[in-house]
Amino acid sequence: MDVILLQRIKNLGKLGDKVSVKAGYGRNFLIPQGKAVAATEANTAAFEARRAELEKQEAEVLAAAQARAEQLNEVNIVITAKAGDEGKLFGSIGTRDIADALTNAGLTVDRAEVRLPNGALRHTGEFNIAIQLHHDVVAEVLVTIVSE
């Protein structure tokens, strides 16, 4: 099944690309979610008429993500947690805890945007945490974990 992408899809393509996908993926996921339209002649013509509008929307989303990244790069978060004598936490600090701490600091961050490549944080100390705001925009936040 051929579809025209209405937004960037990881490992598939970017806005306006005509790609071939399995019929179930296109019919059950991409089209109902508004991420693509079937590549018929009518849809191709309609997409070309809306291309400038869609590219403008994508540019606005990118600009908003860059503005949020500038705010996040200036923020340092301190999280207190129970820890043993050697700095090992009783439990862990995960994406939800970091997102909640950033929200309490006045910034809106979804837990899905927080990237912890090595899993949850289990020790006290300072950590640089990546916040993926857009596929092209990643902010770095310094998170300090101290024991109670």
From Swiss-Prot:
Record keyword Coiled coil present: no
Keywords: Ribonucleoprotein, Ribosomal protein, RNA-binding, rRNA-binding
GO molecular function: rRNA binding; structural constituent of ribosome
GO biological process: translation
Keyword RNA-binding: yes
SUPFAM superfamilies registered for this protein in UniProt: L9 N-domain-like, Ribosomal protein L9 C-domain
A GO term from the CC aspect: ribonucleoprotein complex
Pfam families for the chain: Ribosomal_L9_C (PF03948), Ribosomal_L9_N (PF01281)
The organism's place on the tree of life at top rank: Bacteria
Gene3D superfamilies: Ribosomal protein L9, C-terminal domain (3.10.430.100), Ribosomal protein L9, N-terminal domain (3.40.5.10)
Role played: Binds to the 23S rRNA.
Family affiliation: Belongs to the bacterial ribosomal protein bL9 family.
Identification of the protein by name: Large ribosomal subunit protein bL9
Organism of origin: Acinetobacter baumannii (strain AB0057)
Taxonomic classification: Bacteria, Pseudomonadati, Pseudomonadota, Gammaproteobacteria, Moraxellales
